């Protein structure tokens, strides 16, 4: 079998659901982690510049922000590795399912690819044999992991539940900034509200961002409007929105992974193949 024919068969047997989910996962995590990190930094600057002059008032908030930023670093690394592993699992189980139905002959394609990589059996020295042996060991170890789709279904299900909480929490800063922006719109257009401009405020203490004894803790009237007009506020608001969208995209990708893995696992069990290929 030629290399082109082998590649064509591999493309036909590609797990497109896993490919789409992987791309969506990487995009969502990058958006969530990158924008979320910068949005937290912007929030820290806004709080210490406009809402409190005493470092003791927002010291705890800064520690929490820094802790979340370190968590973001770990989240990005974890999802990069786990997404790649889920993609490999998608190729592995989808190939097995299509081999059952006769749509995709993984053994033939695998032989063609192996012959292309190792250069065939003829004329191969000890170095080539050593490399081939190392590759076989790696594939064998990887196959032990990928040969248990039930574990991936369980882990992905638990991860989806956890990420659902992350998605809900990512909506909180969007809600706070949206309320602040709405208050600024009321100040900018007094005809839309019957309240006095001086009584329209954004109170960081009300959301638990600052303790109740923080001073001033809130900004009202024209001072609040001037804050909303700053590029720093606008950028932070939009970064939180982007992080929220990234969390939603990641949640959709995890659901897609879980559905695809569950389907493949169910087919393999029903066809009596078990989880060993």
Curated annotation (Swiss-Prot):
Membrane-spanning residues: 11-36, 60-88, 152-178, 239-268
One Pfam family hit: Myelin_PLP
Membrane topology, Cytoplasmic segments: 1-10, 89-151, 269-277
Chain positions found as Phosphoserine: 114
One cellular-component annotation, GO: myelin sheath
Disulphide bridges: 184-228, 201-220
Extracellular side: 37-59, 179-238
Main location: membrane
Lipidation feature positions (O-palmitoyl threonine): 199
Keyword Transmembrane helix in annotation: yes
Lipidated residues (S-palmitoyl cysteine): 6-7, 10, 109, 139, 141
Keyword Transmembrane helix recorded: yes
Leader peptide range in chain numbering: none
Molecular function terms from GO: structural constituent of myelin sheath
Function according to Swiss-Prot or TrEMBL: This is the major myelin protein from the central nervous system. It plays an important role in the formation or maintenance of the multilamellar structure of myelin.
Identification of the protein by name: Myelin proteolipid protein
